Every structure is written in structure tokens, then in C-alpha cells.
Design a protein with these regions (language model features):
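Structural motif at transmembrane-helix junctions in multi-pass transporters
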Residues: 1-5, 52-69, 145-147
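Membrane-interface helix termini and inter-helical loops of multi-pass transporters
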Residues: 1-2, 28-30, 59, 105-118, ...
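Transmembrane alpha-helical segments that form core, pore/gating elements
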Residues: 2, 14-17, 22, 77-78, ...
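Hydrophobic/aromatic residues within transmembrane alpha-helices
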Residues: 5, 9, 57, 83-85, ...
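Hydrophobic residues within alpha-helical transmembrane segments
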Residues: 7-12, 38, 42-45, 72, ...
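Loop-to-transmembrane-helix transition segments
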Residues: 29-53, 118-126, 161, 170-173
Length: 173
């Protein structure tokens, strides 16, 4: 099930990273979590959004299409950097972006005929969340965003907890 996968895909790395972080940085770990401030909370929400939309993309289209849509992260990040950080990309960046957009439109059009467009849409949204996260981190490079990532993973586990159909792992050894 999609939500079961999302729950474990978030809980296990999130809790492992949390424990590891406190073991490695036990004296300063709490201060690091407090120091993320508003940018860290916003970034954690983007991580939450990207985790959810990634799994929904995989559940609603083929893996290749989902990954192509998610590979748009650099394109979307450059657009966000242009809009929010006032960066001026070079002409070649805009040309490459246009070529990528044409390819994505072609893939999206094909998905419309196969009725798999929802997964492609989730893939683009996922890429947008990741690009937004990168933009926040670039704009606040003085912040340690590892605690923010951990928080985002644990928030994803908490949200997905409400939709889990079974806690059975179904491991076969």
C-alpha cells in the first residue's frame, strides 16, 4: 500500500538519523534543532511535501515517467532562484530549460492518452518541492539543515500514520 510504504520510508530513516545525530552531536543536538528557525521549518514542510508526492507519483504512473518528472528539479530550482533569489541564469540555461520543457510536455501528453497523468503531475509537484527546499537552503546557507531534513522525515511519518492500512511489514526470509 502507498501509505504503508511512505510511513516506513519516512519513519525508519528519520528515526535512524535522529538517533545517530544525537549520538554524534549529543551536546549540541538540541541547539541545532532549535537553530533551524523558520527557514528550517519551511524546509521541513517542503521535505514532507516531496516525500508524499514522490510516493504518489510512483503509485500513479510508471517509474520512468515519475523519475523524468522529478529530474526537473534543476530546471525548477533555476526558475525559483531567478524569481526568489534574483539570480540571472545564462542564456544556455534558458535554452536547456526550454528543451527539457518540450520533452516533459511530450511525456505528459502521452500520459494523458494512457490516463496516467496524475502520477506525472505528482512527479512535477515533487520536483517543485525539492527545488523549493534547495532554494531555501541556498538562501540560508548559514543554517545546518540536517535537523530540518530529520524533522521533515518524521513529519512525513506522522502524516502518513493516519492513512496506514496495516503495520505488518510482510518480510519473507
Amino acid at each position: 500500500d502507498t501509505w504503508d510504504l511512505l510511513f516506513y520510508r519516512s519513519l525508519l530513516p528519520g528515526s535512524t538519523l535522529l538517533i545517530g545525530y544525537f549520538i554524534l552531536f549529543h551536546y549540541r543536538a538540541m541547539n541545532d534543532f532549535r537553530a533551524i528557525g523558520q527557514p528550517g521549518i519551511v524546509n521541513a514542510l517542503f521535505i514532507l511535501g516531496s516525500n508524499i508526492t514522490f510516493i504518489l507519483a510512483l503509485a500513479n504512473t510508471n517509474v520512468a515517467n515519475a523519475l523524468v518528472m522529478i529530474s526537473l528539479v534543476p530546471l525548477i530550482a533555476s526558475i525559483f532562484s531567478f524569481i526568489f533569489l534574483n539570480e540571472k541564469p545564462e542564456l544556455i540555461t534558458w535554452i536547456c530549460s526550454l528543451v527539457c520543457m518540450i520533452a516533459v510536455i511530450f511525456i505528459f501528453y502521452e500520459s494523458l492518452s494512457l490516463n496516467q497523468y496524475l502520477g506525472d503531475f505528482y512527479g512535477v509537484i515533487c520536483a517543485s518541492f525539492v527545488a523549493a527546499s534547495l532554494t531555501v537552503m541556498r538562501n540560508n546557507s548559514h543554517i545546518n539543515f540536517v535537523p530540518s531534513y530529520i524533522l521533515g522525515k518524521l513529519m512525513t511519518a506522522l502524516v502518513s500514520l493516519f492513512f496506514v492500512s496495516s503495520f505488518a511489514l510482510g518480510l519473507s526470509l
